[in-house]
């Protein structure tokens, strides 16, 4: 019997678009020499829904339900950037209580996003147990979201000038109980995962990105901070009321997959610190700005709060909130990095241009460089450490 010769040429393999490790409908065309990766070409666009064009034909409040479909694991951040941009453009003041509520919701959403990164990331490298652990804590988070917004996901909670509803009775106590409980769970994750020798073998020294390289690629979020750059927009831009709280930016120097894991684990603990301080210091007062005006056609200047010239932004399905003829770039520190909106108004209720800067799309661009000369199994580790959601990448 003749033995066939060993194939020595290159092999091209398709990973995705529905491979379980692809974190969505991402397709990778991988060129292999044995188990060594020679080239990797990401193919995007399978989840493109024209989100930027839709924004040009909707008022801001009409568009809010759409934005929760970008990063559907951290919807509070997409809502925040959608209302922050017109607030800045129209010089709308947000009540202090509403700002505190926003910070609490944003940090809870950050924890939820990092939890649903941690479980699949561990499953990618062969550890199934943490995948079930994170759903235990995530369920408690979603109970808090459901009690305050009415929805477990796709909350549609933020409004121009505030939030849709105040925190219900007893919610703050439940949130504090969750914070105390969750700190013990993070300690459990670190005990089970961080010092596990098998885990360290899979992630240490894999997918290294230097600090200058990260800046040149435009990386942000944990991808940037794990490369030795302590850059966090909550500290840099002082949006909402983050400057009133005592917390530290989490960062590492090594730039590998382990460093990105450590940054996200540390961020969950810091988020709990911010939430506890916000709950302790939350002021009274209104949860929305009821005095966001629209121009009165009669030209009256002395008006009462209940006159027709007042437009109650949160109370109408499609309020007449004009976007002045200006351009503006707004950004927030989302769990995956810098989420930005470049908006141009033209004295209309619809934005003339609505450009989205998704952190996942920018961070994904470095993937081909990271996986070259690595093993095939390392692709899952590196891709998982980047943390992408294809709804945000493809928009």
UniProtKB/Swiss-Prot annotation:
GO terms for molecular function: NAD binding; oxidoreductase activity, acting on NAD(P)H, quinone or similar compound as acceptor; quinone binding. It is a peripheral membrane protein. Pfam families: Complex1_49kDa (PF00346). GO terms for cellular component: chloroplast thylakoid membrane. It catalyses: a plastoquinone + NADH + (n+1) H(+)(in) = a plastoquinol + NAD(+) + n H(+)(out); a plastoquinone + NADPH + (n+1) H(+)(in) = a plastoquinol + NADP(+) + n H(+)(out). Its EC number is 7.1.1.-. It is an enzyme of class 7 (translocase). GO terms for biological process: photosynthesis, light reaction. It is found in: Plastid, Chloroplast thylakoid membrane. Gene3D superfamilies: Cytochrome-c3 Hydrogenase, chain B. Keywords: Chloroplast, Membrane, NAD, NADP, Plastid, Plastoquinone, Quinone, Thylakoid, Translocase, Transport. NDH is composed of at least 16 different subunits, 5 of which are encoded in the nucleus. NDH shuttles electrons from NAD(P)H:plastoquinone, via FMN and iron-sulfur (Fe-S) centers, to quinones in the photosynthetic chain and possibly in a chloroplast respiratory chain. The immediate electron acceptor for the enzyme in this species is believed to be plastoquinone. Couples the redox reaction to proton translocation, and thus conserves the redox energy in a proton gradient. HAMAP family: NDH1_NuoD (MF_01358). Belongs to the complex I 49 kDa subunit family. This is NAD(P)H-quinone oxidoreductase subunit H, chloroplastic. The lineage of its organism: Eukaryota, Viridiplantae, Streptophyta, Embryophyta, Tracheophyta. The gene is ndhH.
